[in-house]
Amino acid sequence: MITVRAPATSANLGSGFDVFGAALERPADILRIEKANRTTIRVTGVGSKYIPEDPEKNTVGAVAEALDAPAHIEIDKGVRPASGLGSSAASAAAAAVGLNELYDRGLSREELVPIAAEGEAVVSGAAHADNVAPSIMGGFTVAREDGVTQVDASIPLVACLPEIVVSTRDARGVVPEAAPMEAVVDVVGNAATLAVGMARDDPALVGRGMEDSIVTPERAELINGYETVRSAAENAGATGVTISGAGPTVIAACHRGDRTAIASAMLDAFSEAGVEARAYKTEIGRGAELF
């Protein structure tokens, strides 16, 4: 048997729609995997009752099929489904890394990314790598069709998860089909700023680079209290605030000493909007780990 821990992730980060992603130190999924004649899955943990154990309907089953690596896989969910924190990606990433090791497939971490992305497509409907890439490789990632660029970073973050469900499919439904050139230019500049900030480990630059005027405003309408929470986080010291992935998690970049105040402010703001929430004081960290 092999045990794998794969982290939650934050995709998009505002200006990097479908391209940027970051691994979070917490929360995480833990998978226990052992060889078998056919793939079977057991799911426990956060939101497990909403996750199918049928291998044909579960991300890890698709990964096992792609690697020709049948196994009994126990998934302990630490990342809530429909949270905007890459829940299905964490399981797919852990399965890819664990099965690659267990069956001695010899694939690199980067080579595992498209396999895990195909697995995640079972849930999200499309093979996007912006979550699986950082969950496998760690740090900050830029996922393109021709490969992944990865940068180690340790930017402090607060991820505030409200008790609201926003599915990836619903969130994609509000994405504009086109945008004014002025907005596109602004977002390109912000994305470049964020990438430089990651390379420099500079929370101020990362926060500035999170600004987005195309996708985020549309998705914000799906999150009750978003603008109030964003303002509260900024007033408490956040350098930037945006929606994590498809939402509803709201993520704030900050300096390390401000995380507690920001987390408290975001929780209070959601509470004022009548929404219960949980805050993770975290940071950009490692990818999937074998035990």
Curated annotation (Swiss-Prot):
- The top EC class is transferase
Q: Which InterPro entries match?
A: GHMP_kinase_C_dom, GHMP_kinase_C_sf, GHMP_kinase_N_dom, Homoserine_kinase, Ribosomal_Su5_D2-typ_SF, Ribsml_uS5_D2-typ_fold_subgr
Family named by the database record = Belongs to the GHMP kinase family. Homoserine kinase subfamily.
Organism of origin is: Natronomonas pharaonis (strain ATCC 35678 / DSM 2160 / CIP 103997 / JCM 8858 / NBRC 14720 / NCIMB 2260 / Gabara)
Provide the Gene Ontology terms for cellular component: cytoplasm
What keywords are annotated for this sequence in UniProt? Amino-acid biosynthesis, ATP-binding, Cytoplasm, Kinase, Nucleotide-binding, Threonine biosynthesis, Transferase
| Disulphide bonds in the chain | none
Q: List the SUPFAM superfamilies.
A: GHMP Kinase, C-terminal domain (SSF55060), Ribosomal protein S5 domain 2-like (SSF54211)
Recorded protein name is: Homoserine kinase
In which residues is ATP bound? Answer: 80-90
Q: EC number(s) of the enzyme?
A: 2.7.1.39
Q: Where in the cell does this protein reside?
A: Cytoplasm
Described by its record, this protein's role is as follows: Catalyzes the ATP-dependent phosphorylation of L-homoserine to L-homoserine phosphate.
- Pathway named in the protein's UniProt entry: Amino-acid biosynthesis; L-threonine biosynthesis; L-threonine from L-aspartate: step 4/5
Tell me if Amino-acid biosynthesis is a UniProt keyword of this record: yes
Q: Give GO terms: molecular function aspect only.
A: ATP binding; homoserine kinase activity
Q: Which reaction does it catalyse?
A: L-homoserine + ATP = O-phospho-L-homoserine + ADP + H(+)
Q: Name one GO biological process term.
A: threonine biosynthetic process
Q: Which Pfam families match?
A: GHMP_kinases_C (PF08544), GHMP_kinases_N (PF00288)
